[in-house]
Amino acid sequence: YCVNVTAIFIDIVGSSNITDERKRPTLAKMYRAFLSECVAIMNAEIDCKEININGDCVWGVFDTPYKSDIDNVISVAAKLNSMIKILDYKLRKKNYSEISVGIGIDYGRALMVKAGYSGSGINDVIWMGDVVNSACHLCNKAGRDYRKVIVISDVVYNNLNEHNQGLFSSYSDGWVTRYEGDIINISMNDWYNENCK
């Protein structure tokens, strides 16, 4: 069935270069830390209906029937961005190079389909629709080519409260206006400042 949702994607920028410069055990630990922390942050939200991992990309689908729910997804993005700051500190301490990420967010209708083969044990919920594709596309622009870490669609921006709108600036992406920001979670940032010196 169709439902209005907000999709968020986060992936590591330049991950193919990371595999070239790191040994496999180190790479596995770094990816495991990144993926598990992203999943934990998304999974902690009651509105999160689905989390998927594709390579170095983690994406979630959030049930957002109210505008305040969309603001909550922005706070998830801020937590993800703050978590990367902490993870980079841990990587620096071990003399590993830091990682950077892109986060893309969009809102719209998605088709939820249960797909698989009966009796095979493969019977997953699949989320399809422009909102999922668009959030993935925005993620691929975020954190690259002078873009800030978080890129959101105009639909997401227009549904945010005034405070959250003030955290983003607009830019033109062809004929479309997008919004970008580098927002953080204040309490996580305070913890970072106290513990990561």
Question: What kind of feature is each model-predicted range?
Answer:
Residues E45-I53:
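Short beta-strand elements
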Residues L111-A115, N159-E162:
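Switch/connector loops and helix/strand junctions flanking conserved nucleotide-binding motifs
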Residues M112-C139:
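Catalytic-core segments of nucleotide cyclases and related cyclic-nucleotide turnover enzymes
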Residues D106, D130-V155:
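Catalytic/regulatory signature loops of cyclic-dinucleotide turnover enzymes
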Residues K23-T26, I53, C57-E98, I105:
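Short helix/loop segment flanking the catalytic signature motif in cyclic-nucleotide metabolism enzymes
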Residues D11-V13, G104-A110:
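Short glycine-rich beta-strand segments
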Residues R144-K197:
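Intrinsically disordered, glycine/charged-rich C-terminal tails and inter-domain linkers
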Residues Y1-K29, S36, A40-E45:
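Juxtacatalytic helix/coil linker segments
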